[in-house]
């Protein structure tokens, strides 16, 4: 049943029950540029951001509060607009810029991209929440799930934990592959 393979809990339970080792890939940023975790949570660890977002994001009935949460995070940066930006045309989110223009990441004490994105010139910033190619919304909504799954015994999130657990969760970038897999 294909639908089951799209449910990480089922994959993890099945792998553990059958003694399998499994790698589960997620196509969104599992972290933010250096300095963000400490600024948001007081802890310089990606896991602290996952935990914080798990307490802030609501995502039920195909509705979520990602733009509200991004606006709330942006409000903790009095040095200027950002770091998050972009939202649907016609919507107003005070404190969440529509465009990247005017965001001074250096003044915020952050970088626009992670080290991982510097290796892929066409990669979008994890701060970009909306429009083609953006991954910011996927990260805001996916990281609470990563937090929940990381609490299951036998699950590790690489590279934040050693990949020697039976189930390893990792960030993947499928569009880097040119041909069929």
Where do the PLM segments sit?
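RNase H-like (RuvC/DEDD) metal-dependent nuclease/polynucleotide-processing core
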Residues: 2-23, 28-181
């Amino acid at each position: 049943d294909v639908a089951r393979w799209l449910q990480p809990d089922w994959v993890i339970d099945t792998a553990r029950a059958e003694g399998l080792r499994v790698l589960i890939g997620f196509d969104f940023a599992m972290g933010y540029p250096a300095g963000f975790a400490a600024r948001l949570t007081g802890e310089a660890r990606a896991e602290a951001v996952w935990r914080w977002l798990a307490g802030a994001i609501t995502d039920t009935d195909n509705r979520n509060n990602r733009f509200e949460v991004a606006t709330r995070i942006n409000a903790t940066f009095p040095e200027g607009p950002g770091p998050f930006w972009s939202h649907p045309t016609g919507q107003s989110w005070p404190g969440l810029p529509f465009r990247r223009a005017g965001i001074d990441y250096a003044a915020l004490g952050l970088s626009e991209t992670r080290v991982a994105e510097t290796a892929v010139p066409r990669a979008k910033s994890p701060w970009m929440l909306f429009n083609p190619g953006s991954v910011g919304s996927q990260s805001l909504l996916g990281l609470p799930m990563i937090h929940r799954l990381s609490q299951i015994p036998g699950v590790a999130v690489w590279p934040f934990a050693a990949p020697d657990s039976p189930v390893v969760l990792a960030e993947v970038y499928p569009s880097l592959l040119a041909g069929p897999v």
